[in-house]
UniProtKB/Swiss-Prot annotation:
This is Protein LST8 homolog. Part of a minimal complex, TORC1, consisting of mTor, raptor and lst8. Interacts with mTor but not raptor. Does not require raptor for binding to mTor. Part of a minimal complex, TORC2, consisting of mTor, rictor and lst8. Subunit of TORC1 and TORC2, which regulate cell growth and survival in response to nutrient and hormonal signals. Essential for TORC2-mediated regulation of cell growth and phosphorylation of Akt1. However it is not required for TORC1-mediated functions such as TORC1-dependent regulation of cell growth, autophagy and phosphorylation of S6K. Pfam families: Beta-prop_EML_2, WD40. InterPro entries: Beta-prop_EML-like_2nd (IPR055442), G-protein_beta_WD-40_rep (IPR020472), MLST8 (IPR037588), WD40/YVTN_repeat-like_dom_sf (IPR015943), WD40_repeat_CS (IPR019775), WD40_repeat_dom_sf (IPR036322), WD40_rpt (IPR001680). It comes from Drosophila melanogaster. GO terms for biological process: positive regulation of cell size; positive regulation of insulin receptor signaling pathway; positive regulation of phosphatidylinositol 3-kinase/protein kinase B signal transduction; positive regulation of transcription by transcription factor localization; protein localization to nucleus; regulation of actin cytoskeleton organization; TOR signaling; TORC2 signaling.
Length: 313
């Protein structure tokens, strides 16, 4: 997993703190205060790895990872209700956020200070959003069961409702751009095949429904090599699905706890999980074994961020 000095895991949760860990040792190297009125809903590191963005109830914060400062360096103004997701465009030029105010926002990160430059209205609280690897389309999932695909350049969008009376909890697009996944509060994960021709907006073709869990699905994510899809749940499990036929390959269990978030390593062989017992874990997927615990949070961990690179390919 890359240069060990660069292997930084970030976690946040209900104890209003964000912790930064050396992934290879389990040592906590920095603790940053979030806001006292909110848990951490999502974390993402800037592409240059120097800063960490966090979002929660009526707040978006940006922290400096290279200094000893534990306070945010930027507070984003004018955010209403719960901010549920965020992420960065690959060059770091803009950031997207999604929230329960029904909006997905594009923030210009080159401007000083950063400001909101575009808004998409989903007409319902937005639980999830992710960026297509083409860097122009954003997938979104809302509480009324809608899945949107928004082309930021052309302003075109497509809307699909895969299941009535269900809330979309997370969305993910495979790094190779072939699949879109949307997971809901009934334990189902829907897959669409994505196709794009002549630089036009991607089209969605229904692929399958995976009855993945008995309870809420909290997160779905594809592995960097696009060969695996994970789903995490309130049933205490992480299920790993092979994307060649979407059969279940592995199941990891943290009994009696919700698994709120997870992240693959760059080589797709390792997995980090965040759960309601306040522990982040590193798993070796081949053996389904938990090999390291990251302990220090006093309440549930609800978000994590990990990005490394394959060295010496």
């Amino acid at each position: 997993m890359g240069d060990q000095q660069q292997l930084i895991l970030a976690t946040g949760g209900y104890d209003h703190t964000i912790k930064v860990w050396q992934a290879h040792t389990g040592n906590c190297i920095k603790t940053m205060r979030f806001v006292e009125t909110s848990q951490v809903n999502a974390l993402d590191r800037t592409p240059d790895k120097t800063r960490l963005a966090a979002c929660g109830y009526q707040c978006i914060r940006l922290y400096d990872l290279e200094s000893n400062c534990t306070a945010p360096v930027i507070n984003f103004d004018g955010v209403q209700k719960n901010v549920t997701r965020l992420g960065f465009q690959e060059d770091g030029n803009w950031m997207f956020t999604a929230g329960e105010d029904h909006h997905v926002r594009i923030w210009d990160m080159i401007a000083a200070p950063p400001h909101c430059s575009r808004i998409f209205d989903c007409e319902a609280p937005v639980n999830a959003a992710c960026l297509h690897p083409n860097q122009v389309e954003i997938a979104m999932g809302s509480q009324n069961g809608s899945v949107f695909l928004w082309d930021v350049k052309s302003e075109r969008h497509e809307r699909i409702v895969p299941e009535v009376d269900a809330s979309i909890q997370d969305v993910a697009i495979s790094p190779d751009g072939r699949y879109l996944a949307a997971a809901n509060n009934k334990g189902n994960c829907y897959i669409w095949s994505l196709t794009s021709q002549d630089q036009k907006m991607s089209t969605l073709r229904p692929n399958r429904k995976i009855p993945a869990h008995s309870r809420y699905i909290l997160r779905c994510k594809f592995s960097p090599d696009s060969r695996l899809l994970l789903t995490t749940s309130g049933d205490g499990t992480v299920c790993i699905w092979k994307t060649d036929d979407f059969s279940k390959w592995r199941e990891l269990c943290i009994e009696n706890y919700w698994v709120w978030d997870a992240a693959f390593s760059a080589d797709s062989k390792w997995l980090f999980t965040a759960s309601s017992d306040g522990i982040a874990r590193l798993w070796k997927l081949q053996t389904k074994s938990s090999i390291r615990d990251y302990t220090g949070h006093t309440k549930a961990i609800t978000a994590l961020s990990f990005k490394d690179e394959i060295v010496g390919k």
